[in-house]
């Protein structure tokens, strides 16, 4: 793969990005809160909570957009001279597949224990992380299994394409990088309009949202690859010295404002593929440059770093805790129950605590040992280059998560 190029490459290419590690937890926690909220907010049935619904529901999609943009940014940032496609793909698979296999195995066991059907459609595509390519709700969503792994199917496409995209990215003239960034951001915004050409029926289960347009804009890996490319372009802008110097706090305010606008005032189909990706790219670049230049960043605090390290594991276990933990959403009628405010808060709190504990265990017992042992082929004498893998920021991303 090509080495970083540009006037600031020597300064930035080997720098760790702890702020982005901390941001990963925020994004993963947004997904967790979203999935808790889509159940508990309606179950409480309090009119004064109704205004929160669009914002709670938008937290998860926004977190996923962040992860996809972040993947493109960090992989481009940390691309090493002399790296091969085979080694790159090996590192990425070792990063995601051990956690995936363990959590999918746990999901199958829990489905059997609770008398939920285990079928080829809700397990085999998920096992091979191809479910997002199949526009079938039972395959993509499979609610009683580990449904959020649909995003890993998108990540696999990103990883497959990255060794091809990176040399093309390096060929773009630096003065045109912002033009390309704007073009990709605009293309993301056009996806819902392209989706209008797709059938309005069927609708997504328990909603009035047309399934085909939703699948195309939200689940289809090719559509989501635009966000990955946005992250790649953003990293190249920073590496080439073309960053506008936006500080971290203003970037956070811009991202927050874009979330409020898209979640509160834009129809769901459009808000899930919107300009928020552009503002999240600015936030990621601002966090990276804050680290490189030694500027203050809340996301570099030790607690945030720890939580960021376990964020991928958190993402992988949280849905199973929601289904089979205190909220018991996998039981019959679990999605249509009623709850008091105090009961909902208790169930939500227990779900968060259990998720964090299981995420830490999965990280310590599965993810970290697997990365340390298998990310690189063994050297002569039985040692490995895993320490080198851990030293690079590419080992610090969601899904890289």
Where are these regions (language model features)?
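Hydrophobic alpha-helical membrane-insertion segments
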Residues: 30-31, 99-114, 180-191, 273, ...
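Functionally critical transmembrane alpha-helices in membrane proteins and complexes, commonly lining
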Residues: 15-80, 97-103, 121, 125-135, ...
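Transmembrane alpha-helical segments and their boundary/interface "anchor" motifs
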Residues: 24, 59-65, 77-111, 119-125, ...
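Alpha-helical transmembrane segments of multipass membrane proteins
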Residues: 103, 107, 187-191, 280, ...
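Aromatic-enriched alpha-helical transmembrane segments of multi-pass intramembrane proteins
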Residues: 18-21, 60, 124, 128-153, ...
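Structural signal for the C-terminal ends of transmembrane alpha-helices
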Residues: 76-82, 111-113, 164-173, 234-242, ...
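C-terminal "closing" transmembrane helix and its immediate cytosolic amphipathic cap
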Residues: 1-11, 304, 319-401
């Amino acid at each position: 793969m090509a080495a970083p190029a540009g006037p600031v490459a020597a300064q930035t290419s080997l720098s760790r990005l702890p702020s982005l590690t901390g941001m990963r937890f925020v994004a993963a926690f947004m997904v967790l809160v979203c999935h808790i909220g889509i159940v508990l907010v309606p179950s409480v049935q309090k009119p004064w909570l109704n205004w929160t619904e669009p914002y709670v529901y938008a937290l998860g999609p926004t977190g996923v957009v962040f992860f996809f943009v972040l993947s493109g940014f960090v992989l481009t940032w940390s691309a090493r001279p002399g790296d091969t496609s085979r080694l790159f793909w090996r590192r990425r698979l070792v990063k995601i597949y051990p956690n995936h296999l363990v959590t999918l195995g746990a999901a199958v066991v829990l489905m059997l224990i609770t008398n939920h059907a285990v079928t080829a459609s809700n397990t085999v595509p998920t096992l091979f992380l191809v479910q997002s390519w199949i526009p079938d709700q039972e395959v993509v969503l499979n609610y009683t299994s580990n449904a959020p792994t649909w995003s890993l199917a998108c990540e696999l496409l990103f990883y497959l394409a990255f060794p091809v995209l990176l040399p093309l990215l390096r060929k773009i003239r630096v003065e045109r990088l912002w033009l390309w960034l704007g073009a990709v951001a605009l293309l993301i915004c056009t996806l819902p309009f392209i989706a209008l050409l797709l059938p309005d029926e069927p609708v997504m289960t328990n909603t009035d949202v047309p399934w085909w347009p939703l699948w195309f804009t939200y689940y289809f890996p090719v559509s989501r690859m635009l966000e990955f490319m946005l992250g790649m372009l953003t990293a190249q802008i920073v590496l080439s010295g073309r960053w506008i110097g936006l500080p971290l706090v203003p970037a956070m305010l811009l991202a927050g404002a874009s979330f409020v606008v898209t979640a509160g005032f834009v129809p769901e189909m459009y808000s899930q593929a919107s300009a928020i990706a552009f503002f999240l790219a600015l936030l990621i670049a601002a966090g990276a440059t804050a680290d490189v230049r030694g500027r203050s960043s809340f996301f570099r605090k030790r607690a945030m770093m720890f939580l960021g390290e376990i964020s991928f594991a958190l993402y992988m276990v949280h849905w199973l805790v929601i289904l089979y933990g205190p909220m018991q959403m996998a039981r019959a009628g679990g999605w249509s129950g009623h709850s008091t405010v105090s009961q909902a808060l208790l169930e939500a709190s227990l779900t968060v605590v259990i998720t964090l504990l299981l995420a830490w265990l999965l990280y310590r017992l599965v993810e970290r040992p697997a990365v340390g042992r298998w990310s690189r082929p063994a050297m002569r004498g039985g040692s490995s280059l895993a320490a080198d893998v851990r030293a690079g920021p590419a080992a610090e991303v969601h899904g890289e998560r």
